[in-house]
Amino acid sequence: MFRKTLIFSLFAILASISASAQHRDILKECIYTPADSARVVRLLAEKAPQGGEVLYYARKFLGVPYVAATLERSKQERLIINLKELDCSTLAETVLALAATKRAGGRRFEDYCHTLMQFRYRGGRPDGYVSRLHYFTWWANSAVKNGLLQHVDGQRKRFSKQLVPNVYYMSANADKYPLLKGRPARIDSIARLEKAENGKPLGYYILQENTGLGRNALPEVRDGDLIGIVTNKKGLDCSHLGFAVWGKDGKLHLLNASSIHKKVVEEPKTLRQYLSEHPSSIGIIVYRLTDNPLKTNRKNMTKVYVMSTCPDCAAVKELAKEDSRFELIDLGEHVRNLKAFLRLRDTHPAFEKVKARGSIGIPCFLSEDGSVSFSLEDYFEKHPDAEPSGEACSLDGKGC
């Protein structure tokens, strides 16, 4: 009985710590204007059609000026929210984050910021320039892994070619990127990520010549689906993004932030015509927002509570950032609650086992199955199927 009461108390304390603190902390990592935050709240309050949220929100940005590289304006990597200037990537992220937040019942600006982070960053939080998902293949893989998007491939006779990325454009052209230029360590990090991800098949796409087919021939593609334009340019995967719109002519069109039109538009020409004017465009890969993106993303997640100053938490933090099954929560700024947490931790039976082995780091793992762990090793003993590497883990900073 004591143990059950203790575990319940532990959950209650940590929940109260994180609920308000997470939202306060998230805004510290954001750059935005009051006008943009107010507009996000207004958009979330609107009655978007259920199932049609993506195209609904995409059309809210028609006419917004096209401006490239708006995420490169801060030397310190933070979540930049800018609804007044968009390029193809920021339009896609902005719209999908609004639609996902709406589907999850989110109403606050902080809810939107949290969702946008899930799309934009490896591990779901900004942690330096390299944490941003710069290539489309990285971005899409992360979104699928986190349950935000699903790949659409339909009948193989239409989705006939597999996209196998071979990206190296950024590391080979670092001088074109202000936040990479003259930063060899950062360039090396990008190059390592490029090498690590290359060769992993992303999914099947529709060849350019089939994009002019009608709705009956391409029933898998729906209004509001995300379209990535696959390119044959060396070192790149996709050259442009937009949203699918079935026109009155029965053909696919593209809603996109256009550098040609200098604003967000629904292209009057068909997607087939659009692609034919860009010889490097060889097809389209299609993704769709999942029905319950944030619920899917947070399903079966283990909360990981750490101290930012904890010297033994390197392995824990690294794991939580890389694996979407973990939600990392920093206790560092909440000393009073931390003291209460430590008192409970020190008397918890599960902690006695860890303490006896000499591992007494701060981390605490709270799983949805109700189990409590105080080290990576202890966590993986309880959840052997979750272990990503099959190796023993510890809190000595050496990782697992």
Give the role of each language-model region.
Residues 225-293:
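C-terminal soluble interaction/assembly domains
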Residues 65-201, 250, 255-259:
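Acidic/His-rich structured neighborhood in mature extracellular/periplasmic domains
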Residues 342-371:
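Short, structured active-site "lid" loops
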Residues 357-361, 372-400:
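Non-globular targeting/processing and membrane-anchoring segments
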Residues 7-16:
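Bacterial N-terminal signal peptides
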Residues 300-329:
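Local sequence-structure signature of Cys/Sec-based thiol-disulfide redox active-site neighborhoods
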Residues 326-347:
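Thiol-based oxidoreductase modules, predominantly thioredoxin-like and allied folds used
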